[in-house]
From Swiss-Prot:
This is Sulfite reductase [NADPH] hemoprotein beta-component. Gene3D superfamilies: Sulfite Reductase Hemoprotein, domain 1. The lineage of its organism: Bacteria, Pseudomonadati, Pseudomonadota, Gammaproteobacteria, Enterobacterales. InterPro entries: CysI (IPR011786), NiRdtase/SiRdtase_haem-b_fer (IPR005117), Nit/Sulf_reduc_fer-like_dom_sf (IPR036136), NO2/SO3_Rdtase_4Fe4S_dom (IPR006067), NO2/SO3_Rdtase_4Fe4S_prot (IPR045169), NO2/SO3_Rdtase_4Fe4S_sf (IPR045854), NO2/SO3_Rdtase_FeS/sirohaem_BS (IPR006066). NCBIfam families: CysI (TIGR02041), PRK13504.1 (NF010029). Binds 1 siroheme per subunit. Binds 1 [4Fe-4S] cluster per subunit. Belongs to the nitrite and sulfite reductase 4Fe-4S domain family.
Amino acid sequence: MSEKHPGPLVVTGKLSDGERMKSQSNFLRGTIAEDLNDGLTGGFNGDNFLLIRFHGMYQQDDRDIRAERAEQKLEPRHAMMLRCRLPGGIITPQQWLGIDKFAADNTLYGSIRITNRQTFQFHGILKGNVKPAHQLLNQLGLDALATANDVNRNVLCTSNPVESVLHQEAYEWAKKISEHLLPRTRAYAEIWLDAEKVATTDEEPILGATYLPRKFKTTVVIPPQNDVDLHANDLNFVAVADKGKLVGFNVLVGGGLSIAHGDKNTYPRKASEFGYIPLQHTLAIAEAVVTTQRDWGNRTDRKNAKTKYTLERVGVEVFKAEVEKRAGVSFGAIKPYQFTGRGDRIGWVKGIDKKWHLTLFIENGRLLDYPGRSLKTGVAEIAKIHQGDFRLTANQNLIVAGVPEKDKARIEALAREHGLMDDSVSPQRENSMACVSFPTCPLAMAEAERFLPEFVTRIEGILQQHGLPDEHIVMRVTGCPNGCGRALLAEMGLVGKAVGRYNLHLGGNREGTRIPRMYRENITEDEILAITDQLVGRWAKERHTDEGFGDFVIRVGVIAPVIDSARDFYDVQEAV
């Protein structure tokens, strides 16, 4: 341990109740199977409420009608959100048609939600439809295993359709990493797929009998795009190419954005550079990072249990040395890499494989049929004729990938007919993102997805007023401090504090390599817009050529940059 990080390798003390729950779960089985047959409640009881998360589900209820149901002496309208495991975000048109039909027939909302972790979610699955949902995924060659709770979650991979060979190689590694780090328990197959129970003891050689201390997120990144927001993730493999071929990875560890309001022991953190590895060591390094965090992560306090806190407690060099020891691999010096942006290239691009790729902007990732814009039907119609694949992006958009020249006009016609292509969408709207929040998320403190569209319209008005209609601010809204909307890597981030109120963070950058600092606490939409109007006015007049909004507010002293978030994230800055 270093002088800067005198903390112990293992935190001792009373374990959190989550650890009890996992240890008593019989490798994630609990009594979920019995609970499925309990018709007296629409929800899962006791430990099962949390255990189902390991199976890719969250128990939710419609918060818009919660009080009304309570007055009627009814339990909340319980329904499950189910999240698919889809490493790298690639799904076939045939698979898509299967999930499209299920969403229409078996969910309360009828929508498909593309997430910023490159997968899709069903919202509003009633308890009786949960098992059929898992069985449908299995029939389609998919599953929901380990997309939530204390495991390695869905592995992201940069959506880069132009560099087709490099993307394919990176995507294959994302799949391998995902498979390697999956739970080995047979609980998922037994409960949902009616697999035969085998009279052997489960083993979890990588994750351990009580799994990880907290959720764990992994990415494969292809510079110069940082669409996956690597600094929001525990483990990152940054692709290093030679003549267009993947040869190895720079490894970065310990990023994460989740905080808790009022708890200064929680903070966002950028990932630390560990070094370079050739391809053949990828799985060994992934496993070593995960097992080190498994053994050293804080199991007494879930708010302090993520990899970022372990690194701060023991020190980056100590953690890195342990990873090298466990993997039997020494990191080389970091290879040069640079990020230039993280937005998706909306519209058509041609790959080096001569195929065309169409990126469709899906506001908030929500596919539903709206009056005059039948988005969900449109994607299904494209799926019926498309010969390539679909790619879900970390910006919640959808790429129709691998389109031959002869099909291009037909697919564009369908996209335009159903409102999936709209030339009037502004750069600001394309670079704004929100988490789901109300009405389904139980953690929501303020609106996010439902708030964003009209809020963006008002931001567009401010940009227009100051002569910047084609400019944009990377803007994120998250309904609570858990950070699903990745607001703490935005140029302007809104973090929900209470209904109608947000903490406003400024000073991130377009590349996603700087954490924004809180500028105002607990303010209303109108207050945020007044501040934005003032600052955009200055930006329009005083900015340097091609200077982004986040870089500008730091350069002119509106706010100080976050340099070392574990120590300076909460420093109070006098606003200019």
